[in-house]
């Protein structure tokens, strides 16, 4: 055992042991409690950053701790390998996306191995492998057969120069990120999965997720956006279809003074066909994608279409406007405008001098409608037969009236829209459909799956390479045998990440998407990832799990039992980025200090849910602590080995009850720390675990070894310390455990048990406050009376109470606190 801590040698030795023993390969065991720990799998960018180090260390610490508790632990790793960066690299560097991706995976795998994470590598999944996406295609066809998949036209961002669809993040100031061309809003045919069919269950089952952050659940509730309201039908003059609008305030219907539709609403296009000014307005809105969050602050613009609708109760004509604040993707793309009682409608009415009709009278307050809209409930006025009704009653009465006259109905509306899974990109899973002129859309037969993504394609940066690949596109219809074409869209990459966690359980299964192993391992017991995935990946994965459940593939309702959302890693108060020059390279960190130091620092510097501020001095402090643990263990190695030999031979036994006072006190501290650290591990509060380990080490390193019992105490305490640290710093603990003569490998050692008798003590430390301010401390016997405690408190705080009258003495036993109140 070297005197000096050499992290590179230590970590290589530990990793070789784990690799040789296949320490983390796991199989199903019905006799043990299972624990499935999973961190969101990474996109293979080629290099790990400190955010990766923190995220995956968190998962590894949890997995190792649960294993120490005796559970059957699965912790797999894989690669979310499809996506836009690979295509961009192909265009820029003239390298096939597959080759670029494989190189990046190899580089990142090497970095993961250096971190020492306890992964079952035999379950490694790469989503761009046909053996993986074959079953995604198979499942999509099952959903199509159930009527849960359909194709319809939808508006997308279109780059007219590159002839391709752009993701929202590829549109910069209204222009294509690569070509610089003005982006157009274009309607093309897209594939959708009916997530709205599961909206109610996705919403209600959030209540069962007790171990999810409340913030994430609320974000999903808001995204699903369930609301109870009324659908109202307006007949349109010289137009064949009724205009449907949705509102939660039908009590304001009598105050509607105009209607407004989205710029891409069919009625807007109809109006533009006969009105040049309307067409010019629509053209001016092309390429402007408005986020919902921007609606409150954006300039509201519109134009009168010249068309009119009929009010369903009064029969009066209402002008129909096209407005940029109405979004086609929300509701029906049309709204009834009540300027007196909706602030957005009021602002628009003020700008275009449209009438404002008050129909709700505030109760017991005055309101100036020249200044703003009144948006609360009240008493109806100017509403004909509905006058004098309270808003709450009027909502029901007016809805009933509309239903009786076929002019509307009560309905439940969701903000959530069906999931558009089409991408007009190359590097993704091919959608397994064939388009035949005679038969329409025909699924690829199961026996022809997977539809393999061809690699012999040309990347010009213009259009989708798949559309130019004749060998891929031109096929025979499996239904009629005539010439047909293959679907050239690929799946949104969120599809791959919506079910990968279940496939980890069944890696190697060639005859089915999932098998009974998925039912054993799912749901994931602990999932770890960023909160930025709250309403995309996490919602889609919940949806997919319910789809798989209904197909009989899994037997649980939710995919992830517990969710931990870690904070970001910051440096100088900012997120690490190359542009800011504040990036810390994990490779350099590991080369300099070792993986254990990196792991210890990221666990100690902050609670997992909070942002972590990088600190070079903090890293050095973590390294110094490990060096001290190593040096102490080396200093006492021979003694510890001798004690181990005694214990293994059955001769080592100490009656702790008969030990001297100072030993009992130190042992009490050690077991207090053990109890608290175990509690903190259970709550994922690893920063306080590390703090406890440092206190424990200080206690034993300062302890004077004088008797045989003292030696056994140090042996017991170092055994506890190493096991407490092992999930966080596994390499150094592995080597020290072996070199100090402990039985088995530390990864197979049971979690240390708290000796409850050690938690009992003959003495208690008290603090004394005088008028609420800390003034003294003292130690007293556990059986001291109240009178004795108060007398001791007065004695130790003598300088602060002399010449004062003590009005009251308050003892707070559970806090070991005595407060003296003086006059």
From Swiss-Prot:
Main location: cytoplasm
Location(s), subcellular: Cytoplasm
GO cellular component terms listed in the entry, alphabetical order: cytosol
Enzyme type, top EC level: ligase
InterPro entries: aa-tRNA-synth_I_CS, aa-tRNA-synth_Ia, Leu-tRNA-ligase, Leu_tRNA-synth_edit, M/V/L/I-tRNA-synth_anticd-bd, Methionyl/Leucyl_tRNA_Synth, Rossmann-like_a/b/a_fold, tRNAsynth_Ia_anticodon-bd
Any GO BP: leucyl-tRNA aminoacylation
Short sequence motif 'KMSKS' region: positions: 575-579
Keywords on record: Aminoacyl-tRNA synthetase, ATP-binding, Cytoplasm, Ligase, Nucleotide-binding, Protein biosynthesis
The protein's Enzyme Commission number: 6.1.1.4
Reaction(s) the record says it catalyses: tRNA(Leu) + L-leucine + ATP = L-leucyl-tRNA(Leu) + AMP + diphosphate
Disulfide bond entries: none
GO MF assignments: aminoacyl-tRNA deacylase activity; ATP binding; leucine-tRNA ligase activity
Position of sequence motif 'HIGH' region: 42-52
Pfam families listed in its UniProt record: Anticodon_1, tRNA-synt_1, tRNA-synt_1_2, tRNA-synt_1g
Positions contributing to ATP binding: 578
UniProt-listed PANTHER family: LEUCINE--TRNA LIGASE, MITOCHONDRIAL, LEUCYL-TRNA SYNTHETASE
Similarity remark: Belongs to the class-I aminoacyl-tRNA synthetase family.
Protein name: Leucine--tRNA ligase
Provenance organism: Legionella pneumophila subsp. pneumophila (strain Philadelphia 1 / ATCC 33152 / DSM 7513)
């Amino acid at each position: 055992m070297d005197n000096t801590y050499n992290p590179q040698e230590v970590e290589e030795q530990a990793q070789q042991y784990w690799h040789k023993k296949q320490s983390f390969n796991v199989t199903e065991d019905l006799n043990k409690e299972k624990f499935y720990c999973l961190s969101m799998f990474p996109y293979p960018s080629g290099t790990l950053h400190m955010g990766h180090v923190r995220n995956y260390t968190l998962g590894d610490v949890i997995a190792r701790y649960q294993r120490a508790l005796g559970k059957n632990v699965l912790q797999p790793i894989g690669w979310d390998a499809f996506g836009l960066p690979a295509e961009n690299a192909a265009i820029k560097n003239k390298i096939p996306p597959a080759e670029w991706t494989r190189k990046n995976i190899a580089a990142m795998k090497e970095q993961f191995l250096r971190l020492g994470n306890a992964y079952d590598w035999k379950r490694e999944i790469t989503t761009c492998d046909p053996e993986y996406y074959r079953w995604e295609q198979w499942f999509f066809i099952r959903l199509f057969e159930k009527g849960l998949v359909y194709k319809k036209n939808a508006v997308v961002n279109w780059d007219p120069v590159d002839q391709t669809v752009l993701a929202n993040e590829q549109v910069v100031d209204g222009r294509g990120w690569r070509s610089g061309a003005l982006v157009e809003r274009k309607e093309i045919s897209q594939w959708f999965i009916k997530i709205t069919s599961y909206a109610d269950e996705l919403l209600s089952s959030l209540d069962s997720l007790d171990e999810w952050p409340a913030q994430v659940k609320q974000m999903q509730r808001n995204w699903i956006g369930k609301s109870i309201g009324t659908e109202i039908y307006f007949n349109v003059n010289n137009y064949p279809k009724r205009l449907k609008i949705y509102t939660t305030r039908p009590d304001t219907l009598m105050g509607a003074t105009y209607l407004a539709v989205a710029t891409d609403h069919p009625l807007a296009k109809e109006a533009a066909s006969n009105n040049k000014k309307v067409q010019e307005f629509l053209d001016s809105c092309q390429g402007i994608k408005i986020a919902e969050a921007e609606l409150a602050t954006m300039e509201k613009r519109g134009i009168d279409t010249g068309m009119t609708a009929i009010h369903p109760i009064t029969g009066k004509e209402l002008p129909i406007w096209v407005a940029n604040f109405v979004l086609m993707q929300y509701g029906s793309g049309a709204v009834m405008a009540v300027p007196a009682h909706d602030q957005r409608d009021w602002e628009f009415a003020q700008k275009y001098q449209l009438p404002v009709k008050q129909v709700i009278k505030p109760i017991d307050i005055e309101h100036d409608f020249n200044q703003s809209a009144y948006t609360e409930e009240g008493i109806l006025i100017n509403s004909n037969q509905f006058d004098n009704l309270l808003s709450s009653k009027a909502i029901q009465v007016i809805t009933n009236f509309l239903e009786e006259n076929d002019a509307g109905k009560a309905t439940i509306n969701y903000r959530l829209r069906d999931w558009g899974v089409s991408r007009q990109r190359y590097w993704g899973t091919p959608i397994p459909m064939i388009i035949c002129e005679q038969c329409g859309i025909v699924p690829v037969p199961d026996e022809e799956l997977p539809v393999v993504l061809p690699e012999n394609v040309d990347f010009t940066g213009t259009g989708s390479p798949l559309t130019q690949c004749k060998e891929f596109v031109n096929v025979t219809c499996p239904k009629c045998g005539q010439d047909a074409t293959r679907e050239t869209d690929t799946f949104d990459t969120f599809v791959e990440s919506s079910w990968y966690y279940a496939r980890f359980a069944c890696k190697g299964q060639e005859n089915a998407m999932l098998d009974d192993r998925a039912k054993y391992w799912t749901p994931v017991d602990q999932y770890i990832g960023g909160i930025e995935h709250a309403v995309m990946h996490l919602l889609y994965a919940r949806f997919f799990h319910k789809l798989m459940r209904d197909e009989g593939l899994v037997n649980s309702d939710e995919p992830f039992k517990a969710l931990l959302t870690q904070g970001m890693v910051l440096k100088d108060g900012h997120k690490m980025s190359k542009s800011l020059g504040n990036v810390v390279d994990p490779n350099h960190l590991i080369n300099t200090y070792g993986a254990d130091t990196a792991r210890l620092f990221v666990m100690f510097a902050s609670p997992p849910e909070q942002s972590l501020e990088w600190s070079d001095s903090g890293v050095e402090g973590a390294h110094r602590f490990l060096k001290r643990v190593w040096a102490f263990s080396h200093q006492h190695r021979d003694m510890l080995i001798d004690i181990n030999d005694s214990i293994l031979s059955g001769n080592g036994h100490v009656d702790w009850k008969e030990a001297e006072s100072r030993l009992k006190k130190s042992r009490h501290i050690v077991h207090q720390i053990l109890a608290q650290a175990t509690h903190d591990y259970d709550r994922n509060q690893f920063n306080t675990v590390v703090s406890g380990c440092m206190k424990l080490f200080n206690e034993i390193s300062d302890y004077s070894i004088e008797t045989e019992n003292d030696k056994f105490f140090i042996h017991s305490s170092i055994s506890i310390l190493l096991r407490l640290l092992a999930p966080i710093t596994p390499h150094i603990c592995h080597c020290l455990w072996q070199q100090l003569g402990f039985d088995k490998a530390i990864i197979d050692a049971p979690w240390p048990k708290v000796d409850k008798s050690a938690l009992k003590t003959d003495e208690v430390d008290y603090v004394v406050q005088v008028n609420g301010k800390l003034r003294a401390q003292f130690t007293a016997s556990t059986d001291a009376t109240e009178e004795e405690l108060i007398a001791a408190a007065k004695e130790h705080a003598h300088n602060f109470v002399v010449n004062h009258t003590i009005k009251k003495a308050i003892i707070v036993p559970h806090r070991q606190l005595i407060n003296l109140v003086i006059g």
